[in-house]
Amino acid sequence: NSDTVGWIQIPGTQISYPLMHTSDDSYYLNHTFSKKLNSAGSIFVETLNNGDFSDLHTIIYGHNMKNGSMFAGLKEYSSASYLVAHPNVYIDLADGTHAYQIFSVYEAEADSDSYTIGFAPDETYEEYLKTIKGRSLYDTSVTVTKEDSIITLSTCTKHGEKRFLVLSLIHI
């Protein structure tokens, strides 16, 4: 499928899927990577982001499936001990594997500023990073700066318009 831009994996979890990117965010909400209609959908990158992860902030979406598939496992990060056991997210792209270290975990509204993209490495971005790190359910002891590129893994919760977010910075 030409919409495939990479692979996402969190070792020791069920999260290991192709990453999709298309001009229609709603398409992969209910289509598999093989473009078959399916309520589980796919894991996909925000349409407004570059598919090569060149943005300072890239957002990745996936459903919170009752059977534990897709991004259902993200909710386990509400426990600090789970983060200790699973601290990194790996993204395989055309230019190699990129390791991301988790620095913040929290719930937010679907229309939250947590979904802001299009940053430059300036004071606005630095303030944004400080804000989202401060929202974490617990201290991750990971430092994030305006020179860091980050990803947000986003899934729905049982609380209406709330989303569960796991934010990670690139760790080279």
For the regions a language model picked out, list residue spans one by one.
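Short, surface-exposed loop motifs enriched in S/T, G, D/E and P with embedded aromatic residues
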Residues: 17-23, 100-102, 168
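Glycine-rich, pocket-lining loop/helix-strand segments that form or immediately flank
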Residues: 107-129
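Short, active-site-adjacent segments that bind or coordinate small-molecule cofactors and metal centers
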Residues: 140-164
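N-terminal pre-domains immediately preceding structured catalytic cores
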Residues: 1-45, 50-55
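Conserved small/polar residues in nucleotide/adenosyl-binding loops
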Residues: 170-172
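Mid-length scaffold segments of soluble, non-membrane domains
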Residues: 35, 41-114
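Flexible, polar/acidic helix-loop-strand segments at domain edges
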Residues: 123-142
